[in-house]
Amino acid sequence: MSDESMAEIAKARRDWKTAHLEMYLRSKGAEGHIMDLRDIGGHQFTTQCLVKYIGRKSGKTIITPLIYGDMGGEVVICASKGGADHHPAWYLNIVAGKEVCFQIATQAYRATWREPAGSEREKVWEFMQGVFPPYTAYQASTKRQLPLVMMSPIEPVEIFK
């Protein structure tokens, strides 16, 4: 695929993600939590959360919409970046920071986060492949291990704006 084609795909993806984030925020979480991602290999009822963190370089608050799964009361997200060979910025920012917040539909929380390891990671990875089947192909397309982040709510916070 040409660099020009890749640039067009990247722009379309950014435009789609921006529109989705704006809808989620504008509706105060009433819209945007459930998405039909069958056209890209996902499920009809794919769950999306918002993750809020501080940019490691900018120091600004950033909100990113991400697919998630709930595993044993922890919210699990995958730093896939579509199988790119480098980690997504949101993951690097979370790792560099201390605090993370997430919003699911109309509820938001301050949270702790961790990365599962060993046999727990294997179980969480299997679970996330069920949440969003394209993760399997994403992992196959890169040499890096796709990071998994598990967030545990600490206390409710205001929904994101």
Can you say where each PLM-predicted feature lies in the sequence?
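Short beta-strand segments
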Residues: F45-G82
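Short, charged, solvent-exposed linker or helix-capping segments at domain edges/interfaces
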Residues: W125, F160-K161
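Extreme N-terminal tail/first-helix region
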Residues: M1-G41, K161
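Short beta-strand micro-motifs in enzyme catalytic cores
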Residues: C49, P147-V149
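Short, structured beta-strand-loop surface elements
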Residues: D3-E4, I9-K11, S80-Y135, S141-Q145, ...
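Short beta-strand-to-coil "C-cap" segments at the C-terminal boundary of structured domains/repeats
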Residues: M151-V157
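Short Pro/Gly-enriched beta-strand edge/turn motifs at strand-loop
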Residues: E31-D36, F45-V51, F132
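A short, polar/charged loop/turn motif at coil->beta-strand junctions and beta-hairpin connectors
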Residues: G42-F45, Q145
